[in-house]
Regions:
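An N-terminally biased module of ancient metal coordination in phosphate/nucleic-acid-related enzymes
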Residues: 1-85, 89, 99, 161-175, ...
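Domain-core and long-helix interface of multi-subunit machines
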Residues: 13, 109-210
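Short amphipathic alpha-helices and their capping/turn segments at secondary-structure boundaries
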Residues: 19-32, 90-104, 136-146, 172-176, ...
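Short, hinge-like loop/turn segments at secondary-structure boundaries
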Residues: 52-54, 125-126, 203-205, 232-235
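Hydrophobic alpha-helical segments and helix pairs
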Residues: 77-122
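Mid-to-C-terminal alpha-helical segments outside catalytic/metal-binding sites
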Residues: 229-255
Length: 255
């Protein structure tokens, strides 16, 4: 890997380490690009609190921290400023003007919840419900076609235990949409490292059949994740086994 665009900070409440430690480890690994893409704040109705993302009043500090590191390490490594954003169509109109007033270089789409998160199950929970899978695919396709995102992180996160034929049908639809709108799909190193449901081999078989482009994403929640050569090797083996079109870098899409 020469680039990683999927890096978190402690502001999301489930990552550790200083941003500087991630950058130093990236230099150790010979990376040319280390993009930070922590979980974006969202403006939810009522008193709902989303525990796995930064608060809105932390966004300015996040931006300042990344831009400061970019200036300090200029000439040694590129440090683009990004966010990982869930595609919640009903909530985006309030959030997007805020993000567009900031020097955000890119967004990556992650979809751990369908709907608007508040009253929906986590997409990674096991389900045999065909409708949940269909809704996940519908919402992520809408997100890909929105033009907001540079790539789709862990698209195979959904944990569907129903009929393989249904999974193939729906996820092929997702992959076809990704191909049609030139949306790279992320092979997620954190999922591989922790033995999660993703990377899902059946999904990547479909992605290969549809000719999708892919990118490796460390999804780093600790500085040591940047140094994890073993997991990188395993993900590269998956890419080679399915003859996937691996992108070393991706063009960033501004919002």
């Amino acid at each position: 890997m020469i680039a990683n665009y999927h890096t978190h900070t402690t502001r999301c409440n489930h990552a550790v380490g200083l941003e500087r430690e991630y950058v130093e480890n990236a230099l150790t690994m010979g990376l040319k690009i280390l993009g930070f893409s922590d979980h974006t704040p969202y403006i939810f109705p009522g008193d709902y609190y989303s525990h796995f993302r930064m608060k809105l009043d932390q966004l300015g500090d996040y931006v300042e921290s990344v831009l400061s590191l970019r200036k300090e390490y200029a000439g040694r490594i590129e440090i683009p400023l990004g966010l990982e954003l869930e595609f919640y169509p009903k909530l985006l109109p309030q959030l997007l003007p805020i993000l567009r007033d900031l020097p955000i270089d890119y967004l990556i789409m992650g979809q751990p919840f369908i709907g608007n998160e508040i009253d929906e199950p986590y997409s990674g929970w096991p389900t045999e419900d065909n409708r949940i899978l269909e809704r996940y695919v519908d919402q992520t396709i809408e997100g890909m076609y929105s033009g907001l995102f540079t790539y789709f992180a862990h698209p195979d996160l959904i944990h569907f235990l129903g009929d393989d034929k249904v999974y193939r049908q729906q996820m092929r639809r997702l992959c076809q949409a990704a191909k049609n709108c030139n949306m790279p799909l992320e092979v997620n190193l954190l999922g591989m490292m922790e033995g999660r449901i993703y990377p899902n081999r059946l999904f990547w078989e479909l992605a290969a059949e549809e000719g999708c482009s892919v990118v490796l994403g460390r999804d780093a929640h600790a500085p040591k994740h940047i140094l994890d050569i073993k997991t990188e090797t395993r993900c590269l083996e998956l890419v080679r086994n399915f003859d996937l079109n691996l992108l070393e870098t991706v063009p960033l899409k501004s919002i």
